Amino acid sequence: NILLNIKQRNEKNHTINMFREVSISNDTISVKFYRNEKIECACNFLMDKDAQGYIDLSDMNLTSCHFKGDVISKVSFLSSNLQHVTFECKEIGYCNFTTATVDNVIFRCRRLHNVIFIKASGECVDFSKNILDTVDFSRSQLTHSNFRECQIRNSNFDHCYLYASHFTRAEFLSDKEISFIKSNLTAVMFDHVRISTGNFKDCITERVELTIDYSDIF
């Protein structure tokens, strides 16, 4: 009823921002609703979990949500619309963004680990200055996206479409090789990267810029 009331009022007054500030703790989501930059109300929701024990935020329209908190863990955003969402937290772990729409998503985090972006799609996604540890980007389409100054460990970019994305000063620090097998890297910037091992087999590399500060790749 709270959500319905706010939705009805929102049709008359577009200054209400649904899910402006969201924090997640265990299986509870705390939401603050704002009107004209002031809190309209605050609510806690006990959320269902999926078969894997993840908080289930799949197939939802979460456009422009602002997720805050220390750690966001075990949340499924499967097939959700996350356009213009900001994640502002220390860490995101064991989350699933498979087939999610991620246009203009900003990750203001220190670390993402054990996160899945398989077949996620979007442009202008900002991962800059994050540690990306065991992140699966395979078969995703992340064009014009920002991986500047990331530390990338044990992550997979196979079959990705990364048109015009930037890895400026990224560090690829892995126990095993970083894999871009069969990815489309057209106009991707790998300038001043540090990389020890990598697999670029069968990639499209038209207009790629690659300058390596430290590498055993060759």
PLM features: residue spans?
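Extreme N-terminal basic, low-complexity initiation segments
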Residues: 2-5
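Tandem repeat scaffolds
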Residues: 15-218
